[in-house]
């Protein structure tokens, strides 16, 4: 194999390694963002369930008073 071909191969391998490293970093960032978004969703779900519970309490309270003559 000529030196020129070897140099080209070496450059392509180096480019591939750099690309893989960048993709690994990007994947890690996306995993972190995914975790953050899941936590945010869980918080919204918890708050929404709290509000729905309050509405249910109001509805249950109204149901009792409307049935009483």
Swiss-Prot record:
UniProt key word Transport: no
Coiled-coil residues: 3-60
GO cellular component: cytoplasm
Location (main, coarse): cytoplasm
Disulfide-bond pairs as recorded: none
One of the GO BP terms on file: division septum assembly
Keyword Transferase: no
Compartment(s) of residence: Cytoplasm
UniProt keyword annotations, A-Z: Cell cycle, Cell division, Coiled coil, Cytoplasm, Septation
InterPro entries: Cell_div_ZapB (IPR009252)
SUPFAM superfamilies associated with the record: Mitotic arrest deficient-like 1, Mad1
Family listed: Belongs to the ZapB family.
HAMAP family: ZapB (MF_01196)
Assembly and binders: Homodimer. The ends of the coiled-coil dimer bind to each other, forming polymers. Interacts with FtsZ.
Biological function: Non-essential, abundant cell division factor that is required for proper Z-ring formation. It is recruited early to the divisome by direct interaction with FtsZ, stimulating Z-ring assembly and thereby promoting cell division earlier in the cell cycle. Its recruitment to the Z-ring requires functional FtsA or ZipA.
Name of the protein: Cell division protein ZapB
Species the sequence originates in: Chromohalobacter salexigens (strain ATCC BAA-138 / DSM 3043 / CIP 106854 / NCIMB 13768 / 1H11)
């Amino acid at each position: 194999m000529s030196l020129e071909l070897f140099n080209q191969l070496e450059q392509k391998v180096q480019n591939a390694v750099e690309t893989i490293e960048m993709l690994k970093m990007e994947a890690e960032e996306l995993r972190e963002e995914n975790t953050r978004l899941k936590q945010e969703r869980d918080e919204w779900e918890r708050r929404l369930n709290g509000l729905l519970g309050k509405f249910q309490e109001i509805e249950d309270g109204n149901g009792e008073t409307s049935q009483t003559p």
